[in-house]
Amino acid sequence: MLHTAFISNILANYLGAMSVILPNILTVTGDIKYIGAGLASVGILGTGVGQGLIGQGACLAIGRNPEMASKVTSTMIVSAGISESGAIYSLVIAILLIFVV
């Protein structure tokens, strides 16, 4: 008997607290999606660094061997496209978080 009253009291207090907390959590989730979109945009930093290193390597390679400029340039463009895909994925995720969720 004592345990039943104790547990029902705890359950009533828990539900009372949740009825106060849940509306606040639901209003905060609207703001959390912007934080998530910002964190998803962090992937763009790696893309910028990667493309910078690709450009640097291509310039150094063309400077050392100018005859291979066309091959180096085509390889650089393909590598930059592959590197850019990470930024595009980050952008898509950020847009989905802002407008869909």
Swiss-Prot record:
Its main location: membrane. CDD domains: ATP-synt_Fo_c_NaATPase (cd18184). This is ATP synthase subunit c. F-type ATPases have 2 components, F(1) - the catalytic core - and F(0) - the membrane proton channel. F(1) has five subunits: alpha(3), beta(3), gamma(1), delta(1), epsilon(1). F(0) has three main subunits: a(1), b(2) and c(10-14). The alpha and beta chains form an alternating ring which encloses part of the gamma chain. F(1) is attached to F(0) by a central stalk formed by the gamma and epsilon chains, while a peripheral stalk is formed by the delta and b chains. The chain crosses the membrane at residues 35-55, 81-101. F(1)F(0) ATP synthase produces ATP from ADP in the presence of a proton or sodium gradient. F-type ATPases consist of two structural domains, F(1) containing the extramembraneous catalytic core and F(0) containing the membrane proton channel, linked together by a central stalk and a peripheral stalk. During catalysis, ATP synthesis in the catalytic domain of F(1) is coupled via a rotary mechanism of the central stalk subunits to proton translocation. Key component of the F(0) channel; it plays a direct role in translocation across the membrane. A homomeric c-ring of between 10-14 subunits forms the central stalk rotor element with the F(1) delta and epsilon subunits. One of its GO terms (cellular component) is proton-transporting ATP synthase complex. HAMAP family: ATP_synth_c_bact. InterPro entries: ATP_synth_F0_csu, ATP_synth_F0_csu_DDCD_BS, ATP_synth_F0_csu_sf, ATPase_proteolipid_c-like_dom, F/V-ATP_Csub_sf. PROSITE patterns: ATPASE_C (PS00605). GO terms for molecular function: lipid binding; proton-transporting ATP synthase activity, rotational mechanism. The record marks E84 as: Reversibly protonated during proton transport. The gene is atpE. It is a multi-pass membrane protein.
